[in-house]
């Protein structure tokens, strides 16, 4: 009998400690799982499409096999795309060391002989397409919000009511239309040149803000300027029958912007051209509120990186590294995911790579002893970094030459791609503490930073300077103490002994010294891979920055094995057809976003009005986040609830489920249920989840094997470390949602996000849509092209990319008929080649390979530096921007460098004033809550959008709480016991799995389950909440499904045999009649009882700087329930 890899792994996981098993049986394991490969030939009766997966957000390539079944095309199989840099090709000759994709120029007929690796999630994408709970027609609420009652409406009614307003007939509620908020349209209909008016109005607002920030101007002068503004524009608008309040949110606060800002577009999972498309739409509406779910994704990691590097996504090159420190980065989950990270495991198993896996949970493989688990206490990652940095400083394990270069030109002249600010001097006392000493401060007539190089000089006047300096300098303000940026870091590291740092983080002292020695041997070809486990804490940005100081010290940046950002991509938005997200004639917009990201409180009129009245401007009503690179779920909902900084009238939410995916996101139900705070809520989705249950309108969307998220996308850092990489996603099958019309150019339109936004834009007459709405650029300069449907937009994108790739020499000048014929016979999108006839042959070449990719071996110069352009000039050990930024509640300045700070609230609960709040362990001491719950990701499931993965659910039908054996023994807990986890916000019951794969004092509950709404509703019984208001809303949930049968379930169209194959373990009521199958709503999520910030009205806990959701710090105690549950250890797969 040949043991399959899947069967073997299932058996392997049954062993309590996989690492112990592997240690003794590695040779046997190697023989058992060594696969046999045969050439895979194309199906003679089917189609093959190379596209991109969206089982998670890693963006691997896929090969989709489509065949005829019962007269209908169906997806039969999904495997890996061998051309894609993540999947890596497989052949009989490459059964190990599978590190490379197929060469990009491999003819498609040859490429079809090979396959690429792919994880289980990618293979089970079939069940996302064929999901009985999918919505296929537009729906309208037919009862109170949250009742679960919806009725089908026509596409035309949907568009008309969203634009002009509608009525919930069953309750009598009036729903506003977007037309009421479309300031550009209101001005245009009145006969104004809308953008001329808005542009002049914004200039006037800017002038008001200049007066506000001028210390010589009084409160009276400021109010006079505002009154003059109101008088001017009331008169101008009145000439054509308009009032100022028809255009502005609040004429007394003109800095808040136009009424268009009262529309929020919030997306959950985003992909390249879906993102560009609806960002373009939001800007065409004139709103600043295009928001993303990043606070629930990796925003702490992003914000931390942005501070020190100027770019948000930076990781170590896993292909060229000799050593990796994976800190808070989960094996098999983080980019490049289970598929791409197979390369890390394989390199480690082959002895080419050493990995230290610093995480509260184990990696579940030792790779022949080369992946070493370093258990750590949640939230103490900066303490670990400080211990390691201290040893590196003590032993001189750093690149002093690299660190000494004071400016970028000098560093590049010496062969480095950039410099650090290690030598820049920081003022260390007085009101300007934390700011850089500038040339003008000491009479040098320059605003450049000052360094010490035998004397005090500006950094641009010398090549090298002292990296360790602590002394005094005479300034215009008197004698001041100054320190170099690296001196400050060194002193922070030496503020505690290695033993004291280890006492905080729980890491063995000997391990710190061991890692330091391994760094010495591997530098500079080593680096850190950091992610959610370190970043998604209140102190997350400081954690990330402290860890990245390891990389800066050894000078590994922008080189093989070291830190790199994302690969570049083609000019896919503006090579020939200008489809970029801005500068297409959109309305002028201004004002702070509702979540206040990238905007300082000190730049608001609210702040300056208070200050000029002589009031303390602090606290602000909610925090502002000037240094975060992206947006926040929690602060969006808090802003809506508190109407701060202004009320919101309409929310369009796409591909999202914040109620379940955010920590304590159940609080958001209060906002979603309240029609006075949120008058219009539109959901664009494939099914009705826990958030969309409260929507007024449901727009059916397509998924990624259809037109959903089609287009081109970059890959996350390091993008396999190549110079250019992008996937091209095109449909494998045509959409199963309703055909809603034909565009004027004869192309079919299917119900989806794409066509909904286009049709709304056409009805509102938004700029950038319709006849001649897309301008030609480059070779097409002066020409205009139509935008009436999704196919036109996407074909312009593919044409742009293909022609740029041709210009770069990646797509050949002459494309063979064989390549074009393959695409025209296999790809549904080929039927729209008429849109880009001149570029079609080159588009076909890229489509045939699922994207454009370069090769790793061509991506570095002879010295090992990346051929990519460096993303920045300088990286930072100290940030003046952060040191000058203030906590919006206390008004205190943030600390401007890497530092260990305990996880804490945003503001102190008492009278103390500082830039961070009360430590959480003071509020929730270990004596009351001895455990911390963490929610690691699962290699099988993706947060809370994986319930349709039928095959995966058979492997892992529910999740569990993993508890360390020593903790379990003290509590008398065994695997299979149902335990009660009690947190400050509530309690949940979950089955226990006793394993040594989690650090003592920590409980791990893999996320991805615990659902209660997905078109059908199954009232949750596994948790109880302490918040009476939220608990009452949960108790009001309906139980069951009340959707019309013709509104859902595209599976009914399939051949009976195909249905039985797809759903082998389910009653036909599940796939024919929307019956509730128990596996769909099994398991738990710890998010419902996660921590809140008691200093901010009990909203979900966030990071201080980036507003990231805090997932990995849930204080808890454990109680036995006396109940047991049948529990199969082979199903412990996380």
From Swiss-Prot:
| Membrane-topology annotation of the record | Peripheral membrane protein
Query: Altering residue 17 to Q: what's the impact?
Result: Does not affect TtrD binding
On whether Hydrolase is a keyword of this UniProt record, the answer is no
Comment on bound cofactor: Binds 1 [4Fe-4S] cluster.
Q: Report the cofactors.
A: [4Fe-4S] cluster; Mo-bis(molybdopterin guanine dinucleotide)
Q: Quote the SUPFAM superfamilies the UniProt record gives.
A: ADC-like, Formate dehydrogenase/DMSO reductase, domains 1-3
Q: Which CDD domains match?
A: MopB_CT_Tetrathionate_Arsenate-R, MopB_Tetrathionate-Ra
Q: Annotated Gene Ontology MF terms?
A: 4 iron, 4 sulfur cluster binding; metal ion binding; molybdopterin cofactor binding; oxidoreductase activity
Its signal peptide is 1-31
Q: Which residues bind [4Fe-4S] cluster?
A: 53, 56, 60, 119
Homology family: Belongs to the prokaryotic molybdopterin-containing oxidoreductase family.
Q: What is this protein called?
A: Tetrathionate reductase subunit A
Q: Which organism is it from?
A: Archaeoglobus fulgidus (strain ATCC 49558 / DSM 4304 / JCM 9628 / NBRC 100126 / VC-16)
């Amino acid at each position: 009998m040949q043991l399959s890899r899947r069967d073997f792994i299932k058996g392997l996981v049954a062993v309590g400690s996989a690492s112990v098993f592997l240690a003794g049986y590695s040779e046997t394991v190697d023989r058992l799982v060594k696969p046999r490969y045969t050439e895979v030939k194309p199906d003679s009766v089917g189609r093959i499409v190379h596209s991109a997966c969206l089982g998670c957000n890693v963006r691997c390539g896929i090969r989709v096999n489509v065949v005829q079944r019962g007269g209908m095309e169906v997806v039969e199989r999904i495997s890996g795309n061998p051309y894609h840099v993540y999947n890596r090709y497989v052949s009989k000759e490459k059964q190990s060391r599978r590190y490379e994709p197929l060469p990009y120029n491999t003819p498609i007929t040859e490429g079809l002989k090979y396959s690429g690796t792919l994880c289980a999630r990618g293979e089970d994408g079939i069940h996302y397409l064929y999901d009985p709970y999918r919505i296929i027609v537009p729906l309208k609420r037919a009862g109170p919000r949250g009742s679960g009652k919806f009725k089908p409406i026509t596409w035309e009614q949907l568009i008309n009511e969203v634009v002009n307003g509608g009525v919930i007939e069953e309750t009598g509620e009036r729903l506003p239309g977007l037309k009421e908020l479309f300031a550009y349209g209101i001005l245009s209909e009145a006969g104004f040149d809308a953008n001329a008016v808005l542009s002049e109005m914004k200039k006037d607002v800017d002038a008001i803000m200049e007066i506000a920030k001028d210390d010589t101007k009084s409160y009276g002068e400021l109010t006079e300027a505002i009154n003059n503004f109101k008088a001017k524009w009331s008169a101008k608008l009145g000439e054509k029958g308009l009032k100022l309040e028809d255009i502005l949110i609040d004429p007394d606060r003109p800095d808040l912007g136009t009424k268009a800002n009262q529309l929020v577009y919030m997306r959950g999972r985003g992909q390249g051209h879906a993102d560009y498309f609806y960002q373009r739409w939001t800007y065409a509406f004139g709103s600043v509120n295009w928001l993303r779910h990043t606070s629930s994704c990796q925003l702490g990691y992003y914000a931390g990186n942005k501070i020190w590097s100027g770019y948000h996504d930076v990781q170590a090159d896993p292909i060229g590294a000799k050593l990796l420190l994976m800190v808070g980065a989960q094996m098999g989950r983080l980019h490049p995911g289970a598929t791409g990270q197979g390369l890390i495991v394989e390199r480690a198993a082959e002895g080419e790579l050493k990995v230290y896996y610093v995480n509260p949970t184990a990696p579940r493989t030792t790779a022949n002893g080369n992946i070493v688990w370093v258990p750590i206490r949640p939230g103490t990652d900066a303490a670990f970094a400080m211990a390691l940095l201290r040893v590196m400083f003590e032993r001189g394990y750093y690149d002093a030459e690299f660190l000494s270069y004071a400016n970028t030109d000098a560093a590049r002249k010496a062969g480095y791609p950039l410099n650090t600010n290690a030598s820049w001097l920081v003022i260390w006392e007085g009101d300007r503490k934390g700011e850089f000493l500038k040339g003008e401060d000491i009479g040098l007539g320059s605003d450049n930073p000052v360094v010490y190089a035998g004397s005090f000089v500006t950094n641009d006047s010398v090549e090298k300077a002292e990296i360790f300096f602590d002394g005094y300098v005479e300034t215009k303000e008197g004698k001041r103490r100054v320190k170099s940026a690296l001196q400050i870091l060194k002193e922070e590291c030496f503020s505690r002994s290695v033993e004291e740092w280890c006492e905080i983080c729980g890491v063995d002292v000997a391990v710190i010294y061991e890692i330091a020695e391994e760094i010495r041997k591997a530098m500079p070809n080593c680096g850190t891979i950091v992610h959610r486990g370190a970043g998604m804490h209140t102190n997350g940005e400081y954690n990330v920055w402290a860890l990245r100081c390891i990389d800066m010290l050894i000078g590994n940046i922008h080189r093989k094995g070291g830190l790199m950002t994302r690969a570049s991509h083609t000019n896919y938005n503006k090579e020939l057809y200008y489809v970029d997200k801005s500068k297409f004639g959109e309305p002028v917009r201004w004002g702070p976003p509702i979540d206040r990201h990238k905007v300082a409180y000190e730049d608001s009129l609210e702040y300056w009005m208070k200050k000029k009245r002589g009031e303390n401007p602090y606290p602000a009503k909610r925090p502002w986040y000037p240094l975060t690179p992206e947006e926040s779920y929690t602060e969006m909902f808090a802003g809506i609830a508190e109407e701060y900084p202004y009320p919101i009238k309409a929310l369009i939410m796409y591909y999202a489920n914040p109620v379940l995916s955010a920590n304590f996101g159940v609080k958001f139900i209060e906002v979603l249920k309240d029609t006075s705070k949120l008058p219009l809520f539109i959901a664009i989705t494939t099914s009705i989840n826990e958030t969309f249950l409260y929507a007024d309108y449901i727009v059916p969307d397509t998924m990624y094997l259809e037109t959903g998220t089609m287009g081109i996308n970059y890959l996350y850092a390091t993008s396999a470390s190549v110079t250019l990489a992008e996937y091209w996603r095109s449909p494998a099958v045509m959409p199963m949602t309703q055909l809603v019309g034909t565009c004027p150019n004869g192309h079919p339109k299917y119900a989806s996000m794409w066509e909904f936004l286009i049709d709304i834009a056409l009805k509102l007459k938004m700029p950038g849509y319709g006849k001649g709405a897309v301008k030609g650029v480059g070779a097409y300069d002066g020409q205009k092209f139509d935008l009436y449907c999704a196919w036109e937009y996407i074909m312009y994108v593919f044409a742009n990319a293909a022609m740029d790739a041709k210009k770069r020499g990646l797509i050949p000048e002459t494309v063979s008929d064989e390549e074009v014929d393959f695409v025209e016979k296999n790809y549904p999108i080929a039927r729209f080649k008429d849109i880009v006839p001149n570029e079609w042959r080159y588009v076909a070449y890229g489509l045939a390979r699922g994207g454009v990719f370069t090769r790793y071996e061509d991506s570095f110069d002879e010295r090992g530096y990346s051929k990519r352009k460096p993303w920045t000039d300088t990286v930072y050990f100290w940030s003046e921007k952060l040191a000058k930024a203030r906590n919006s509640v206390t008004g205190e300045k943030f600390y401007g460098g890497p530092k260990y700070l305990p996880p804490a609230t945003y503001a102190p609960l008492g009278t103390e004033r500082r830039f961070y709040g009360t430590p959480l362990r003071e509020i929730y001491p270990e004596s009351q809550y001895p455990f911390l719950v963490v929610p690691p990701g699962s290699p099988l499931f993706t947060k809370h959008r994986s319930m349709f993965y039928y095959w995966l659910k058979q492997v892992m039908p529910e999740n569990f709480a993993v508890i360390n054996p020593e903790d379990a023994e003290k509590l008398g807990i065994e695997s299979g016991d149902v335990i009660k986890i009690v947190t400050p916000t509530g309690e949940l019951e979950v089955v226990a799995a006793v394993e040594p794969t989690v650090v003592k004092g920590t409980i791990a509950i893999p996320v991805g389950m615990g659902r209660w709404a997905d078109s059908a509703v199954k009232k949750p019984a596994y948790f109880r909440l302490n918040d009476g208001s939220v608990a009452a809303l949960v108790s009001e949930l309906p139980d069951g499904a009340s959707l019309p049968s013709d509104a859902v379930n595209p599976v009914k169209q399939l051949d009976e045999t195909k249905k039985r194959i797809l759903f082998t373990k389910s009653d036909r009521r599940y796939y024919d009649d929307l019956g509730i199958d128990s596996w769909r709503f099994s398991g738990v999520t710890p998010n419902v009882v996660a921590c809140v910030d008691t200093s901010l009205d009990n909203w979900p806990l966030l990071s201080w700087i980036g507003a990231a959701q805090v997932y990995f710090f849930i204080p808890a105690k454990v109680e036995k329930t006396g109940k047991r549950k049948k529990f199969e250890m082979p199903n412990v797969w996380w």
